[in-house]
């Protein structure tokens, strides 16, 4: 069961991230540690999905409509790659 999350790569970014987003991110980490990744993926509210293109092999969750946490699975651990703000595409 995958239930460990490594956030070392994004610790500095989280200091600049809005507090409600950080709280939601911490809730996701808590859920992973308590229930494991497979169970948390079943929760539709996180919108856990695979990424395509230059982020192929990575997964993401929605923290809200504008913010995502991007992660990869390495062995029995989740490594957070980035917590990013998504901007609407210009048409």
Please place each PLM-identified region on the residue numbering.
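Sequence-level motif detector for i,i+2 pairs with an aromatic at +2
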Residues: 1-2, 46, 78
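A short, surface-exposed loop/turn module that caps and links secondary-structure elements
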Residues: 34-61
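Generic structural motif
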Residues: 4-5, 48, 69
């Amino acid at each position: 069961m995958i239930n460990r999350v490594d956030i070392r790569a994004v610790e500095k970014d989280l200091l600049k991230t809005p507090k409600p987003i950080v709280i939601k991110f911490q809730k996701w980490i808590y859920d992973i540690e308590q229930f494991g990744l497979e169970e948390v993926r079943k929760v539709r509210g996180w919108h856990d999905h695979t990424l395509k293109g230059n982020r192929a092999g990575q997964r993401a969750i929605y923290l809200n409509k504008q913010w995502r946490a991007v992660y990869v699975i390495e062995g029995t651990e989740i490594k957070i790659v980035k917590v990013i703000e998504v901007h609407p595409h210009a048409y």
